[in-house]
Amino acid sequence: SPWFQGKGPAVPALAESAWIGGWREAGDLTPDSRIIQGKLPNGFRYALLSAPRKGKVSLSLIVGAGSYAERPSERGYAHFTEHLAFTGSTHYPSGTAARFFEENGMKFGRDANAFTSGNRTVFRITLQKADQKTLSESLQVLSDFAGGVLFAPESVASEWGVVLSELALADTEEGRTLADLRKFLYGGTQFEFLPAGDPAVISAASPENLKRFY
């Protein structure tokens, strides 16, 4: 695929439906023989699996970096970057990726979504029609997420509120108990902190620092 053959950083990826089978280069488990796996010259890994859902294609881009890659001054940068990927990129500036999803019958949350964990950031797209044009453009969107996020100042400013709202919603008794438990179990390590981040760090995040982390 030409979308991921550039000279940018290698980004591991695999089909969403292949995730359970797992990507194992070594170990005791035998990979599912139905999964076609490979690696492009730039190090980008891929896996393909024919699924029983006719007329639909599920794509996942799995970036091998999450909140564990953050310094204390970057708490929440991986999660913030995940948000910003949808707001503007090289081929889809100013939120035009959202228009592409809508024009092709996809809805945010259901068909286009993402999440950040400690060791990965995952973008998922489910195509409601499996024609070549839609597939080609969807791969371009994921390629942009991998190496073409723009970090426009206006996008960073608009997403501040969104990310901080998510943090506020999580600031419940249950959420605080979980934070205390993680601190007790993992205090002093990267495992102590949730990917959502630190409100103070998020509020001070600049486009330049976010792009440097990216």
Where in this protein do the model-derived segments appear?
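Acidic/histidine-enriched alpha-helical segments
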Residues: 94, 98, 102, 150-168, ...
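Scaffold signal of the M16-like zinc-metallopeptidase fold and its non-catalytic homologs
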Residues: 8-19, 87-92, 114, 138-141, ...
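Short, solvent-exposed loop/turn elements at domain surfaces
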Residues: 46-49, 55-58, 68-71, 133
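Proteolytic maturation boundary segments
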Residues: 1-48, 56
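M16/insulysin-pitrilysin zinc metalloprotease superfamily fold
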Residues: 29, 87-91, 125-159
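Solvent-exposed coil/turn segments that connect beta secondary-structure elements
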Residues: 41, 51-53, 62-66, 89-90, ...
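M16/MPP (pitrilysin/insulinase) zinc-metallopeptidase core fold and M16-derived inactive scaffolds
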Residues: 58-126, 173, 192-196
